[in-house]
C-alpha cells in the first residue's frame, strides 16, 4: 500500500495530484478515493474499473471486500452528483458482495460503507424512515477502530436530521463528526464534518453559519477538494445570497469537465 496514496485518500495531503502507479487492488481503490475527493470523477471511475476487473470472481474474502468497497465508492460518486437512485443499486451490490462473510474489521468496514451509502441514497429519494433503519443496522456493526465508518454514520445521521427539519439533532450529530474527525488525520473528513456543522447551524444563526462556511470553502480550495468546495459554495450562496470566488456555477463546470455529471432537478 502506498503511503502517499493513503495520505491523499485519508490523510493530510488530499491536494496531491501526482500519484504513484498503483500496484495492488488496495492501492487502486485508494487511488479512486483520492481522485474522487478532488472531483476527478472520470479518472476515479477508471481506477474502480481496474478494481472490478482484478476482483472478478470474488474468490477470497479479501477480493470480495475490495469488490464491495469499489461498488460503494462508485455509488458515492453518483450520489455526490445527485444520482441517488442509481447509487442505491451500487450500494446494494456492495452489501450483497460481503453478505455471509465471517465478521472481521475489513468485512464490517465494507458492510458499514454500504449501509451508510444506502441510508444516504434513501435520503435522496425521500425515504427517511428507511434511512434511519439502515443507520441503526450500521451502528450495530461498527467495531473498535472503524473511525471512518463512525464519522460517516454521524454524517448521514446529521443529513437525515436536516432533511426532517430537526436542526438540534442535526447539530448534535455534526458536532460528533467534528469531534471524531479531529484526531483521525484526514483533512477531507474534518472539512466535511465542519461543513455539515455549518449546515446544521443554519437553523439557529444563518449569518454565523455562512461565515463559518466561508472558512470551510477556503480550506476546500486550498486542499483541492472541489466537490466539497461546490457544496460549501452552494450553502453560502443559498444562505447569504453572496457568491463565492469561484462561484458554484464555475465549480460545477470544472467538476463536469473532470467527469462529474450533475443530475438536473426534475
Regions found by a protein language model. Name each.
Residues 1-13, 20, 47, 54, ...:
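Long, contiguous interaction/recruitment modules in multidomain scaffold/adaptor proteins
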Residues 3, 25-41, 66-84, 110-126, ...:
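Tandem amphipathic alpha-helical repeat scaffolds
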Residues 1-23, 207-266:
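C-terminal non-catalytic interaction modules
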Residues 174, 178-232:
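Glycine/small-residue-rich hydrophobic helix-like segments
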Residues 133-200:
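Aromatic-anchored, glycine/proline-accented short structural segments
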Residues 23, 30, 59-66, 103-110, ...:
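Structural signature of alpha-solenoid helical repeat junctions
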Residues 14-15, 45, 49-59, 92-103, ...:
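Amphipathic alpha-helical segments of tetratricopeptide repeats
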Amino acid at each position: 500500500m502506498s503511503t502517499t496514496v493513503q495520505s491523499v485518500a485519508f490523510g493530510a495531503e488530499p491536494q496531491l495530484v501526482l500519484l504513484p502507479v498503483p500496484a495492488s487492488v488496495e492501492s487502486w481503490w485508494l487511488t479512486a478515493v483520492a481522485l474522487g475527493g478532488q472531483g476527478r470523477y472520470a479518472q476515479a471511475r477508471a481506477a474502480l474499473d481496474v478494481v472490478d476487473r482484478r476482483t472478478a470472481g470474488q474468490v477470497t474474502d479479501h477480493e470480495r471486500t475490495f469488490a464491495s468497497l469499489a461498488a460503494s465508492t462508485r455509488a458515492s460518486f453518483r450520489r455526490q452528483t445527485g444520482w441517488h437512485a442509481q447509487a442505491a443499486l451500487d450500494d446494494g451490490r456492495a452489501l450483497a458482495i460481503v453478505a455471509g462473510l465471517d465478521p472481521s474489521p475489513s468485512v464490517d468496514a465494507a458492510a458499514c460503507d454500504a449501509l451508510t451509502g444506502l441510508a444516504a441514497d434513501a435520503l435522496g429519494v425521500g425515504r427517511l424512515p428507511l434511512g434511519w433503519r439502515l443507520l441503526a443496522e450500521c451502528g450495530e456493526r461498527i467495531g473498535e477502530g472503524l473511525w471512518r465508518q463512525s464519522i460517516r454514520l454521524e454524517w448521514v445521521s446529521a443529513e437525515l436530521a436536516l432533511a426532517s427539519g430537526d436542526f438540534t439533532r442535526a447539530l448534535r450529530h455534526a458536532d460528533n463528526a467534528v469531534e471524531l474527525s479531529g484526531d483521525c488525520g484526514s483533512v477531507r473528513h474534518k472539512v466535511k464534518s465542519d461543513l455539515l456543522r455549518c449546515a446544521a447551524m443554519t437553523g439557529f444563526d444563518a449569518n454565523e453559519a455562512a461565515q463559518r462556511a466561508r472558512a470551510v470553502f477556503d480550506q476546500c480550495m486550498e486542499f483541492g477538494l472541489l466537490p466539497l468546495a461546490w457544496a460549501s459554495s452552494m450553502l453560502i450562496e443559498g444562505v447569504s445570497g453572496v457568491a463565492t470566488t469561484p462561484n458554484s456555477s464555475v465549480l460545477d463546470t470544472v467538476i463536469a469537465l473532470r467527469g462529474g455529471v450533475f443530475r438536473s432537478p426534475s
